[in-house]
Amino acid sequence: MLTVALPKGRIAEQTLEIFAEIFGGEFKFEGRELIMEKEGFKFLNVRNQDVPTYVEHGAADIGVVGLDVITEKELDIIQLLDMQLGKCKVAIGIKNEDELDWNRPNIKVATKMVNIAKNYFAQKAVGVEVVKLYGSIELAPLVGLADAIVDIVETGNTMRENGLKVAEDIMDSSAHLIANKNSFYGKKEEILSLYEKIKAVVESRG
């Protein structure tokens, strides 16, 4: 039996639709259900940020999670497939009236994605102070906590509604199928068989 970690919400629903397309029947978590067993799979309904942790530590054989989370956590897992779900960007946001001037001293950047932000600015040889927040990132520039933010952008509406604009894109992100290294070698046939089936569905959707 393969254990599959899925992030709560839309990505889980869309992934389960792919399983339904492959195996038939209905794949759905009922109410507050955290574990579902069906067709020889055990599905775990976990927080988005926790999916790669479950996979890396072997509590799940495979999982589905955004590339931004994989990049931020820098974990030792195998990336198998871009599932083309939950497409978004990681971007820098600033106030509408501001312009980026990275030569200024003492620039503060607020974000949940500390590693992504630090690595990006290090590559640009820009010295910034990264302020870690856990939510409502858009608030930081409005109250003077930070000069800019690094955050997930899907439509850009949240930034616009808060008087911010996208200044630079850092990376594209979408949901990826990942695997635990030991599971991949120990259950290679099962995982690759499932991978091929999921890949066929993803490609058929264009």
Curated annotation (Swiss-Prot):
Top enzyme category: transferase
Gene name tied to this protein: hisG
Protein name: ATP phosphoribosyltransferase
A Gene Ontology cellular-component term: cytoplasm
Entry EC no(s): 2.4.2.17
Naturally occurring in which organism (per UniProt): Sulfurovum sp. (strain NBC37-1)
Binding partners and assembly: Heteromultimer composed of HisG and HisZ subunits.
Known role: Catalyzes the condensation of ATP and 5-phosphoribose 1-diphosphate to form N'-(5'-phosphoribosyl)-ATP (PR-ATP). Has a crucial role in the pathway because the rate of histidine biosynthesis seems to be controlled primarily by regulation of HisG enzymatic activity.
Domain notes: Lacks the C-terminal regulatory region which is replaced by HisZ.
